[in-house]
C-alpha cells in the first residue's frame, strides 16, 4: 500500500527519477532538433552552380585565381544573393588559411558569398575545431573540395623555425601553436634551399595528409572520390597560388 495516498496498487516514482526522466527527455528532444537542423542544411542549395565534382571545384578555384592575378575579377552582385543565402549555403570549397591579414581567400579565388567555407588560424594547421568544421562542410553542406592554403613569408612558420634552431621562448599560448608547426620545420632542416620556404611547403603537405586521415568522416568521402584534399602556397608578390 502506498503510504502517500493509501492506494494499494499505486506506484509513485521518487522525485529524482522524475527529474532524471524530464532531463533525459529534454536532452533527447534537443538532440533530435539539432540533427534535424543539421540535415536540413544539406537540403538547401541556394547556389546550384556550386554543385561540382572535386576536380571541377579545383578548376574553378584555379580560374578565379588567374582572374585575381590579372585584375579582371568578376562583379559579384551581393544584393541579389542575400535572399537565397539567408536560407542556406552550399559552398563548393573549404579553405584552411593562415590568419595573416595579407591573405584573403575570397579575393584570391575571386569568389562570391556562399562559395567558400573558410577556417583561419595562424600557421594554417589542423586542430579539432578545424577538423570538425570541415566534417560539417563535407557531411552536411556537400562541399567537394578542401584546401590547405599556406603563404610565403609566413610569420608563424618563421617563429617555429626560431624556436627549433635558436630555442626562442614565446609568451602566452604561442608555444602551443609552435608545437603544431615545428614538425614541418624539423622535417626540412638540412635540406637544400631556403629553410622558411621549405618549411611552409612541408607544413601545408603535413596538414593536407592530416586532414585526409584524421577523421573517418572526411576520409570516407575521400576514399569514395566525393571529396579531394589539396594544398597550395599563396605568393604575396603577385597573388598567385602554387598548387602542391
Model-derived segments and spans:
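Divalent-metal-activated hydrolytic enzyme cores
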Residues: 5, 22-28, 44-88, 114, ...
Amino acid at each position: 500500500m502506498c503510504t502517500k495516498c493509501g492506494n494499494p496498487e499505486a506506484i509513485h516514482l521518487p522525485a529524482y527519477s522524475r527529474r532524471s526522466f524530464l532531463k533525459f527527455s529534454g536532452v533527447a528532444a534537443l538532440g533530435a532538433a539539432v540533427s534535424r537542423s543539421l540535415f536540413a542544411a544539406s537540403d538547401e542549395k541556394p547556389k546550384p552552380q556550386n554543385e561540382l565534382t572535386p576536380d571541377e571545384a579545383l578548376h574553378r578555384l584555379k580560374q578565379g585565381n588567374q582572374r585575381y592575378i590579372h585584375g579582371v575579377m568578376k562583379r559579384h552582385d551581393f544584393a541579389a544573393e542575400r535572399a537565397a543565402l539567408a536560407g542556406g549555403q552550399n559552398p563548393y570549397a573549404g579553405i584552411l588559411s593562415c590568419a595573416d591579414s595579407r591573405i584573403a581567400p575570397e579575393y584570391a579565388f575571386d569568389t562570391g558569398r556562399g562559395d567558400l567555407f573558410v577556417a583561419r588560424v595562424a600557421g594554417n594547421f589542423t586542430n579539432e575545431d578545424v577538423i570538425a568544421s570541415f566534417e560539417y562542410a563535407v557531411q552536411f553542406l556537400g562541399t567537394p573540395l578542401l584546401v590547405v592554403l599556406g603563404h610565403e613569408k609566413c610569420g608563424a612558420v618563421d617563429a617555429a623555425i626560431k624556436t627549433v634552431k635558436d630555442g626562442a621562448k614565446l609568451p602566452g599560448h604561442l608555444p602551443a601553436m609552435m608545437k603544431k608547426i615545428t614538425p614541418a620545420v624539423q622535417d626540412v632542416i638540412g635540406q637544400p634551399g631556403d629553410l622558411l620556404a621549405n618549411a611552409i611547403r612541408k607544413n601545408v603537405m603535413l596538414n593536407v595528409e592530416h586532414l585526409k586521415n584524421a577523421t573517418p568522416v572526411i576520409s570516407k568521402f575521400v576514399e569514395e572520390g566525393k571529396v579531394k584534399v589539396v594544398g597550395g602556397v599563396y605568393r604575396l608578390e603577385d597573388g598567385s597560388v602554387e598548387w602542391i
